[in-house]
């Protein structure tokens, strides 16, 4: 496994170096919209293991919410998306070197990233939520006093839970959460009343409950932590590209196409308020 990882890292490094020495090096210096229209192709970098945003299904096909959304956006402009699986740790480098044209895969907008990347409007909200059975009658997190909470081991949700104890940690039983290796394992315990609630990303909660046709049996409550929003990352020079993506977002939401894709993957509308109010 280590040899394989070393080999893959070596290959990626060679590709990056090759990209620097090829025609791709000119991309960061100009607005490339006319080229995208002429070539009728754009390359999007993504992590092909990030369920449900963008991943490979059992047949090897690229699927996911972001896959459907991006394909729909560029279909409006007659441009075909070429999906390029990348090392997520090198995403900004791949973009800078011209090996990809966009970063689009549950990509959070941060001040640090804004220094090197131009972002589209934020299109999707994500936050930590608490999943409970409807039959429990839990309406907000204060109802979880001395209740047993579950969380996925090593998740950002569990980290946030510990970093902000006043929000939830100091309320639940033993001031801690039972940890699980997978959401499915935790959901089984929740269904069988071995835990009273489950802390998880809204993205995953909506997806898994929707796929298993169990949304009607559970409530998804705001956990009380700050939310985050996803946006698309482009090169600083690609001003027109970002403008065109934003225009497509607003048009798709107005026409209901965004909501259709959202409900397909999550069972609800996950658009940001900015997108809804335009």
List each model region and its residues:
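Extended ligand-binding regions for polar small-molecule ligands
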Residues: 21, 67-76, 142, 146-148, ...
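Extracytoplasmic small-molecule ligand-binding "clamshell" domains
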Residues: 26-106, 255
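Periplasmic-binding protein-like
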Residues: 48, 125-132, 202, 210-247, ...
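Short helices/loops that flank or line small-molecule/ion binding pockets
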Residues: 84-85, 89-102, 116-118, 142-145, ...
């Amino acid at each position: 496994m280590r040899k394989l990882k070393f080999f893959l890292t070596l290959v990626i490094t060679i590709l990056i170096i090759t990209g620097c020495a090829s025609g791709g090096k000119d991309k960061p210096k100009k607005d490339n919209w006319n080229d995208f229209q002429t070539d009728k192709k754009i390359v999007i970098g993504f992590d092909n293991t990030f369920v449900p945003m963008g991943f490979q299904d059992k047949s090897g096909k690229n699927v996911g919410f972001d896959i459907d959304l991006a394909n729909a956006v560029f279909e409006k402009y007659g441009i075909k998306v070429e999906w390029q699986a990348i090392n997520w740790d090198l995403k900004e480098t791949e973009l800078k070197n011209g090996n990809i044209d966009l970063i689009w895969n549950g990509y959070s907008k941060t001040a640090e990233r804004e220094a090197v990347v131009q972002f589209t409007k934020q299109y999707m909200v994500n936050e930590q939520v608490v999943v409970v059975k409807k039959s429990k009658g839990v309406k907000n997190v204060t109802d979880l006093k001395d209740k047993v909470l579950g969380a996925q081991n090593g998740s950002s949700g569990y980290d946030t839970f510990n970093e902000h104890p006043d929000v939830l940690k100091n309320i639940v039983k033993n001031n801690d959460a039972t940890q699980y290796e997978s959401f499915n394992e935790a959901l089984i315990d929740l269904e069988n009343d071995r835990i009273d609630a489950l802390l998880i990303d809204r993205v995953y909660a909506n997806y898994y409950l929707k796929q298993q046709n169990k949304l009607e049996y559970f409530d998804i409550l705001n956990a009380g932590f700050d939310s985050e929003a996803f946006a698309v990352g482009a090169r600083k020079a690609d001003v027109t590209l970002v403008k065109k993506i934003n225009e497509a977002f607003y048009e798709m939401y107005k026409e209901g196409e965004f909501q259709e894709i959202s409900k397909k993957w999550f069972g609800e509308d996950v658009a940001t308020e900015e997108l809804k109010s335009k």
